[in-house]
Amino acid sequence: MLSPIRTTFHNSVNIVQSSPCQTVSFAGKEYELKVIDEKTPILFQWFEPNPERYKKDEVPIVNTKQHPYLDNVTNAARIESDRMIGIFVDGDFSVNQKTAFSKLERDFENVMIIYREDVDFSMYDRKLSDIYHDIICEQRLRTEDKRDEYLLNLLEKELREISKAQDSLISMYAKKRNHAWFDFFRNLALLKAGEIFRCTYNTKNHGISFGEGCIYLDMDMILTGKLGTIYAPDGISMHVDRRNDSVNIENSAIIVNRSNHPALLEGLSFMHSKVDAHPYYDGLGKGVKKYFNFTPLHNYNHFCDFIEFNHPNIIMNTSQYTCSSW
């Protein structure tokens, strides 16, 4: 059961000074606190909608006094020198910008650039036409008084307009240049977890095994020391924002102890079943809640305490104090 030590940080998962608790409970079920060890790789993400805003030979990651994101990553690489540090990137980068990325890899032995287009995410894809078709069939099976004729007509019209070349959920998000683009591929990267480091031609990935976990951090997270060994309920935990007397699950820091974590697969199933699914609210939030049997009858604050990833050596979500770098 949950030990008193674990409650020090809002039931967070950063107990590294003593032997780990064995289990923690939520909604009447016990979950093993699984290990994310000191070799688990750290993944950052930078999807750049405007690469032209950088200098010709500059690494295309924001690095200003207000938003020192590249510095935060290189600082993490120095502190966590025994971990691989991945930077998952996407954008219309120039040859010179890709050269700058390569130089960054040479300058830091444990840093890897992982281009989105180099990663095979096809196992997580679904045809848009299949999503539309399933919802249309569900509407048609309803009695007339329960059927939404407006929605049915709209979906049938949009289904006819989907071309073969556009018939892919992943391709649809790859064309976006907004936060949904960022959030969707973050979810897929975390499904891959440590295996995403094996999706490059870089030989630095030799120490990462199939099925390994991953620690994801937004670039506004500042490391002040090593993370050590971390424990998480059934191997998954995430940042919880605590402001203005409210709490909310955040996707800015997420840890998983294995690839294809079933809580994230639950979220993917929501993305595969709704035409208007949202990568954050559905793909992460609803999926994690469903996996851990959260219902409106449960206390959301208690669920956030249960799932929270917090750590004394991470200054969390520093961009909340500034305007967005986007």
UniProtKB/Swiss-Prot annotation:
Reactions that this protein is recorded to catalyse: L-arginyl-[protein] + UDP-N-acetyl-alpha-D-glucosamine = N(omega)-(N-acetyl-beta-D-glucosaminyl)-L-arginyl-[protein] + UDP + H(+)
UniProt-listed Pfam families: SseK_NleB
Record keywords: Glycosyltransferase, Manganese, Metal-binding, Secreted, Toxin, Transferase, Virulence
Cofactor(s) required for function per UniProt: Mn(2+)
Enzyme class, UniProt record, top EC level: transferase
Residues spanning the membrane: none
Active-site residues, as the UniProt record annotates them: 250
Molecular function GO labels: glycosyltransferase activity; metal ion binding; toxin activity
Documented EC number(s): 2.4.1.-
Subcellular localization, as worded in the UniProt entry: Secreted; Host cell
This protein's GO CC annotations: extracellular region; host cell
Binding of Mn(2+), residues: 220, 317, 319
Record's comment describing the protein's domains: Adopts a GT-A fold and acts as an inverting enzyme that converts the alpha-configuration in the UDP-N-acetyl-alpha-D-glucosamine donor to the beta configuration in the N-linked (GlcNAc) arginine product.
Function: Protein-arginine N-acetylglucosaminyltransferase effector that catalyzes the transfer of a single N-acetylglucosamine (GlcNAc) to a conserved arginine residue of host target proteins. In contrast to NleB1, not able to disrupt TNF signaling in infected cells. Shows a lower enzymatic activity than NleB1.
Family: Belongs to the glycosyltransferase NleB family.
Record's protein name: Protein-arginine N-acetylglucosaminyltransferase NleB2
Organism: Escherichia coli O157:H7
Lineage of origin: Bacteria, Pseudomonadati, Pseudomonadota, Gammaproteobacteria, Enterobacterales
